[in-house]
Regions:
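Start-transfer (signal-anchor) and selected internal transmembrane alpha helices
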Residues: 1-39, 228-235
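Extracytosolic helix-loop segments that constitute the early lumenal/periplasmic catalytic or substrate-binding loops
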Residues: 38-40, 56-84, 88-91, 95-103
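Transmembrane-helix motifs of polytopic, lipid-linked glycan transferases
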Residues: 113-142
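Short helix- or helix-capping micro-motifs
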Residues: 146-154, 192, 196
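Membrane-embedded, lumen/periplasm-facing catalytic core of multi-pass transferases
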Residues: 366-517, 531-541, 547-575
Length: 576
């Protein structure tokens, strides 16, 4: 394949008419105008969906960016004994944080949202480039449908602004596939290498079809692919290993990616169980999550492969090559016992592309059939088809908006509560001394130390303490004092998710307690004679709420009447 858009992978047959092409002459700008406000809205309102984001990324970022003065909790993955996470990956995000703090006087909470907004901008730009490349190479209708499916999708609502390697991989998929669709194989493969070698190695299968396509003599050829691979290994493999070796102070290069593969894929750690220690799920777990995150688009995207193979249309095998990575990644993660919703994040855009491609192909066949049967003089038939497409896109968007609204309304309480606590400490009525913030069973909804109170301008940050609860796994511990916390082997760490009793504090040590009080909880409630609520927010009680009401938000108070809610509160010890 020669470089350029003349014959990209998956190209639709004849080029679209000039009038249709002209609509996408500034396609990237138009797509960005649609996407950027939506992604910034996500940055402001999406809940943190996974405690891994908080403790493995926000917390070390907090520790590094504030050089220990802002606190920060350390997981066992950051112990030099295991070194499953890359400090270089954290520091790259820290650059964005430092730029924001240098440009403006941002407090800790504002710094959190500044970085989230930066992620939103990167996501919107990457998605816009992907949609524009799709329109140029596969046809304007495919590009428009991809944008219509992807922009409002609930999965993109929360995944686009997550501080997670899987989200970084999604950005790389978007930019890499945009380059590939335009015939720029070197750029596409470098994006894939960045994703695999620096962010998350398990996304490698998503770039296999691109690599195979690049092997053709008319593309890069074997020698060209080997050259790109060598440059990528040096830039994204060797240099990060040297950087992390310096941070972990091991005296040798440290490849967090290699350690991650050994632990998760080969089971070398965790008593031989690897990631399975943290729970296993059937394949239906992914089916359910895809339906929740993409509703009508999910079955279309999943059926795209068989449908494209079965429908006789020019260029179908090229389109199959473009959508095949989604199936490879889904099969890989579906075959693994340990499953997480975020594992499928890198293929979210490809799912939207697959759905758009199969609809465009089917309509193209129908249009050619209309020509064959002399029905081209019946514009009503074409208008009906286009109207059905618009209705499908609107229905998918409405369901996605309902789902995203449900996530925001039902699970926004932790961010709001901790934000209230932070600004309470900064207010004139705050007590003159710092107090510890304690969490029991709600540890996994802690949004990060960016929300811990700072008592007075530049004052001390409240310590975060754990209270014993029904949870019996291993909790994070505070980093050692700066700068030793990066390289010192912390005590009482294990890779088997075994409970460490040394983590727990007593209620008497607490000035504030954050808790969700549920009717069915095992833990005792706080003594009202000693504690008073500082702030409370409603939080969905999932066990007492039924589908579909808890999964989708309906207006006019319908969801509130159908669902059960509990109070998510920050409690203050009386007398403070």
């Amino acid at each position: 394949m020669a470089p350029g858009p003349a014959e990209p992978p998956g190209a639709s047959s004849p080029p679209p008419p000039q009038t249709e092409r002209s609509r996408w002459e500034n396609g990237w700008v138009w797509a960005l105008a649609v996407l950027l406000p939506l992604r910034l809205l996500s940055a402001a309102s999406a809940p943190i969906m996974d405690c891994d984001e908080t403790f493995n990324y926000w917390e070390p970022l907090r520790y590094l960016s504030y050089q220990g003065s802002g606190g920060g909790m350390q997981t066992w993955e950051y112990s030099p004994t295991y070194a499953l996470r890359s400090y270089l990956y954290i520091e790259l995000h820290g650059l964005v944080l430092r730029i924001g703090r240098a440009l403006a006087s941002l407090d800790d909470v504002q710094s959190f949202y500044w970085l989230r907004s930066g992620l939103a901008v990167v996501s919107a730009g990457s998605e816009a480039a992907f949609c524009a490349a799709t329109a140029d190479s596969l046809g304007p209708r495919v590009g428009a449908l991809t944008l219509a499916f992807m922009a409002p999708a609930s999965g993109m609502f929360h995944a686009s602004v997550a501080l997670l390697p899987s989200t970084t991989c999604m950005y790389c998929v978007l930019l890499g596939f945009a380059a590939w669709l335009r015939g720029r194989h070197v750029l596409g493969l470098m994006c894939g290498s960045l994703a695999v070698l620096l962010a998350w190695p398990f996304v490698a299968l998503a770039f296999v079809p691109m690599g195979l396509d690049a092997l053709r003599p008319s593309a890069l050829g074997f020698a060209g692919v080997v050259g790109v691979a060598a440059a990528a290994i040096l830039a994204f493999g060797c240099l990060p290993a040297l950087f992390d070796g310096w941070y972990y102070a091991t005296g040798r290069p440290v490849s967090a990616v290699a350690n991650l593969i050994l632990y998760n894929a080969l089971g070398q750690g965790g008593g031989g169980r690897g990631a399975d220690l943290y729970g296993t799920e059937p394949f239906s777990f992914y089916v359910k999550n895809l339906l929740l995150n993409f509703n009508l688009v999910a079955p279309l995207g999943l059926l795209a492969g068989p449908a494209l193979a079965a429908i006789p249309a020019e260029g179908r095998w090229r389109r199959l090559l473009a959508v095949s990575p989604a199936y490879l990644v889904l099969l890989l993660f579906g075959s693994m016992a340990h499953k997480e919703e975020r594992f499928l994040t890198p293929i979210y855009p490809l799912l939207c592309l697959s759905a758009a491609a199969v609809l465009d192909t089917a309509l193209g066949v129908a249009e050619r059939g209309a020509v064959a049967f002399g029905l081209t003089r019946r514009p009503r038939a074409r208008a009906v088809c286009n109207s059905l497409l618009v209705l499908l896109a609107l229905a998918a968007a409405a369901l996605s908006a309902s789902r995203s609204m449900a996530l925001h309304v039902n699970f926004r309480a932790p961010l709001r509560i901790y934000e209230h606590l932070y600004y309470h400490a900064a207010g004139p009525a705050a007590p003159p001394r710092a107090g510890s913030v304690c969490i029991g069973k709600e540890w996994y909804r802690f949004p990060s130390s960016f929300f811990l109170p700072r008592w007075g301008p530049g004052g001390a940050v409240s310590p975060l303490l754990w209270l014993n609860s029904s949870f019996t796994g291993q909790l994070p511990r505070p980093f050692e004092p700066w700068p030793g916390g990066i390289s010192v082997v912390p005590p009482h760490m294990n890779d088997r998710n075994e409970e460490e009793p040394s983590r727990y504090s007593q209620l008497s040590d607490c000035a504030f307690v954050v808790d969700l009080e549920l009717p069915q909880q095992e833990e005792p409630t706080l003594d009202r004679a000693a504690w008073e609520p500082l702030a409370c927010e409603p939080f969905l009680d999932a066990e007492r709420s039924r589908l579909p009401w808890r999964a989708f938000h309906l207006p006019f108070g319908i969801s509130q009447r159908r669902n059960a809610y509990a109070e998510y509160c920050v409690w203050r010890r009386k007398g403070r």
